[in-house]
Amino acid sequence: MKVWLLLGLLLLHEALGDVAGQHPPKNKRPKEQGENRIKPTNKKAKPKIPKIKDRDTADSAPKSQSIMMQAMDNGRFQKPAATVSLMAGQSVELRCKGSKVEWSYPAYLDTFKDSRLTVKQNERYGQLTLVNSTTADTGEFSCWERLCNGYICRRDEARTGSTYIFFTEKGELFVPSPSYFDVVYLNPDRQAVVPCRVTAPSAKVTLHREFPAKEIPANGTDIVYDMKRGFVYLQPHSDHQGVVYCKAEAGGKSQISVKYQLLYVEVPSGPPSTTILASSNKVRGGDDISVLCTVLGEPDVEVEFRWIFPGQKDERPVTIQDTWRLIHRGLGHTTRISQSVITVEDFETIDAGYYICTAQNLRGQTTVATTVEFS
């Protein structure tokens, strides 16, 4: 009896051990719609680093920002295209953002102080208005903001704006020229331009020689055509000289430009080539004396003269006369001769000494001197 009792207790102990080793069932519930069904884990997620796209090195530099806006017919403003075509007679209003705006426009408008053009500076923008436009107004209109540090100002290259405006008119294909015959100087060390600009960007333009009569091809090597400038001679030489004209065709119509005389310049660019010569280096009292300062230069380069003379401190009265003319030296070579003459009447002892002439052009200046003695 005891044996059976012990055996029963042993079996009951093993049964209770098996029940204790089992995991109790989980209290499951239905997941709601949209609930994440991915089981959470204890793994640490690596932080995602956003990829940075490579940029061109040029992007790191400040880009030029167009500050120009054009007034439209509907009263709104928009950035103008690089080239704009308008009918002659239309008005133009351009605005450029900035408190200190400067403008550039066709020189034709500035030369004659044209009242049709108005430039104003408002608090936040500059304004340019052109009314009753003509084909002669065709050209580049640009603006830029001026940066100033005290009295020193410079142009802000990052804030500019520009547009080239064609003012078209029926039967007028070329921008009018102030004369019927223009001179273009050919310098061997810089480009030369035959300025036959058109009023319509769609016009086909060709260059022609008057004699012998033939078309001069714009081959892109020696000569190129730029509708904003005209025909550009990239490397002028003496063979290019002669009389030429342009021919434009558009809309089934053609037109001939004014004629251009191409003259080759033999004098190299640089400071004035200057000489000085006195009518006499020994002068008696009471006689008159003249000192001549001469410059040989390029036909289209102006020269300014300045004199220093012995009687200047004593306010000695003198006469100074400046002149210039073109001289032809054969084979079509042309030179500009500029002269300045200082004349002293009734020579006195205070007039004896050094006569110094300084000639200046855009490329520099040259000073020469000669002495005049009292005899």
From Swiss-Prot:
Residues 62-159, 272-375 form the Ig-like C2-type domain. The keyword Disulfide bond applies. Keywords: Disulfide bond, Glycoprotein, Immunoglobulin domain, Repeat, Secreted, Signal. Pfam families: Ig_3 (PF13927), VEGFR-1-like_Ig-like (PF21339). Glycans are attached at residue 219. Residues 19-63 are annotated as: Disordered. Forms a complex composed of PDGFRL, TNK2 and GRB2. This is Platelet-derived growth factor receptor-like protein. It comes from Rattus norvegicus. The gene is Pdgfrl.
